[in-house]
Curated annotation (Swiss-Prot):
Residue ranges of the motif Endocytosis signal: 14-15
Domain of life: Eukaryota
Quaternary structure and partners: Homotetramer. (Microbial infection) Interacts with ebola virus glycoprotein.
Species assigned in the record: Homo sapiens
Binding site for Ca(2+): E359, N361, S363, E366, N377, D378
Tissues in which the protein is found: Predominantly highly expressed in liver sinusoidal endothelial cells and in lymph node. Found in placental endothelium but not in macrophages. Expressed in type II alveolar cells and lung endothelial cells.
UniProt-annotated glycosylation sites, renumbered to this chain: N92, N361
Pfam families the UniProt entry points to: Lectin_C (PF00059)
Gene behind this protein: CLEC4M
Transmembrane segments: 50-70
Chain spans, region 7 X approximate tandem repeats: 108-269
The protein's name in its UniProt record: C-type lectin domain family 4 member M
Amino acid sequence: MSDSKEPRVQQLGLLEEDPTTSGIRLFPRDFQFQQIHGHKSSTGCLGHGALVLQLLSFMLLAGVLVAILVQVSKVPSSLSQEQSEQDAIYQNLTQLKAAVGELSEKSKLQEIYQELTQLKAAVGELPEKSKLQEIYQELTRLKAAVGELPEKSKLQEIYQELTRLKAAVGELPEKSKLQEIYQELTRLKAAVGELPEKSKLQEIYQELTELKAAVGELPEKSKLQEIYQELTQLKAAVGELPDQSKQQQIYQELTDLKTAFERLCRHCPKDWTFFQGNCYFMSNSQRNWHDSVTACQEVRAQLVVIKTAEEQNFLQLQTSRSNRFSWMGLSDLNQEGTWQWVDGSPLSPSFQRYWNSGEPNNSGNEDCAEFSGSGWNDNRCDVDNYWICKKPAACFRDE
């Protein structure tokens, strides 16, 4: 029986798997799988564990490879960043090197600037204005050039300018001579400060001229000769720009002369106001501009024509005190926008400042000028206003 089983076992051995690998035996009967339990089953579990370990090892190896690939991929970008940083460092080093190269020139510029400052201070005290202005202009140009820290070619130009400047300063008078000149100027300034102002002298001279003209019309010959002699003396004294004591004497003589003259006649007719050789009449009634021109002509006068800033201030004060709108002899009737006085003279550009704000505006054919508040205004010529007449002063005797 054993002999019969042995060939069967060998035949089955051809169909049996290794129990260490699968733990399953195949039988030709019914061609089905049959699992053998017991210790054969334990051996199959151990086979599965080895597979799991192999799978885990493979996954770990794959993770390591992925990590290596990631690190390797970062290397080019890191190298590129490192290269750009090196370029930036190199550029900064180049700029620093250039800046260091300019430091020596900067110290030289500071030296030049100090010399220029000293020269400017010295020249600023000198009295020769034309020469000083030329030097000061050169100093200003040099200072501006030095302040800009110029390049080397500019430095050479500055050195040349500085050399010429030093030569120019060397031609100026020495300090002791300057002090002498300055003292002389100080004395002259003090002396001039004691003299009467030019406007005051002109006023005195004008009054003297007017008095002389008025005296010429007086009938008493002996009295006229006496007054004329005093006028001649006063005129000569004023022409010599006398010192303060002489001025007081002139003022006293002038006062006495005016007092004596006023005993003989008045400057202006009754109800007229005298100012700087002229007589002014401020009306108490109102007329339009054309009738105001006629009213002044009837008394041998003229609707006021303003010649000086002093006269304007005087008249503006008179009208503002009385709070009256008063006609003056100014209009643009001949040509719109071209203002003329009644004597035919044009309005001076310097008088444009006397118009009130926004005037003249020609609102409703306003062609005639009036005193209004603190300035001038244009108004319609047919409006009734007060008016001001003007004529030269003369001798008017009391009746």
